[in-house]
């Protein structure tokens, strides 16, 4: 029996952008390491998309946990950057995009919280942006599928 292809996708974003909620919507079961609702180390889940097993890791967004980004990012195939559309792209998110661009790692941006602010996200990069509402699951799978197509 042929083993299904496996892909590691890391979900980045500043604090409180909806990374964990995005992961919860995309995966049936997830593992969280958190304290009082704040991700401390990482969140993990997996799902099958078009016969491919996807391992999803959500990073902590708070500055004090930034050291975890490098650990979680080791060996990633692709990335999702979740931006709170009501705040716009933060400096931390711009830095992550620049690093992904430098390493030629494919990524997409989820312009999240469209239910709070549906204005168009202003972004300097040529990256594909998907309007999302993570609490409703809106736009998430479409964005993930496009990201996975970039790998093939």
From Swiss-Prot:
SUPFAM superfamilies: P-loop containing nucleoside triphosphate hydrolases (SSF52540)
Cited InterPro entries: Gliding_Motility_GTPase, P-loop_NTPase, Small_GTP-bd, Small_GTPase_MJ1339, T_Tr_GTP-bd_dom
Superkingdom assignment: Archaea
CDD domains, per database record: Ras_like_GTPase (cd00882)
GO molecular function, one term: GTP binding
Residues engaged in binding GTP: 13-20, 85-89, 149-152
Pfam families to which the protein is assigned, alphabetical: GTP_EFTU (PF00009)
Keyword terms, alphabetized: GTP-binding, Nucleotide-binding
Family: To M.jannaschii MJ1339.
Protein's name according to its UniProt entry: Uncharacterized protein MTH_765
Species per Swiss-Prot/TrEMBL record: Methanothermobacter thermautotrophicus (strain ATCC 29096 / DSM 1053 / JCM 10044 / NBRC 100330 / Delta H)
Top-level taxonomy: Archaea, Methanobacteriati, Methanobacteriota, Methanomada group, Methanobacteria
């Amino acid at each position: 029996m042929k083993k299904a292809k496996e892909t590691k996708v890391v979900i980045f974003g500043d604090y409180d952008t909806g990374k964990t909620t995005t992961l919860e919507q995309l995966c049936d079961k997830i593992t969280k390491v958190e304290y009082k609702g704040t991700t401390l180390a990482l969140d993990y889940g997996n799902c099958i998309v078009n016969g491919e097993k996807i391992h999803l890791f959500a990073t902590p967004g708070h500055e004090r946990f930034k050291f975890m980004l490098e650990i979680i990012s080791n060996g990633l195939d692709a990335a999702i950057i979740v931006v709170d559309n009501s705040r716009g792209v933060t400096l931390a998110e711009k830095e992550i995009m620049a690093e992904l661009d430098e390493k030629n790692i494919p990524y997409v941006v989820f312009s999240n919280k469209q239910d709070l602010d549906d204005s168009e996200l202003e972004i300097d990069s040529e990256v594909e942006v998907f309007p999302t509402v993570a609490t409703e699951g809106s736009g998430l799978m479409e964005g993930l599928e496009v990201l996975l197509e970039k790998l093939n």
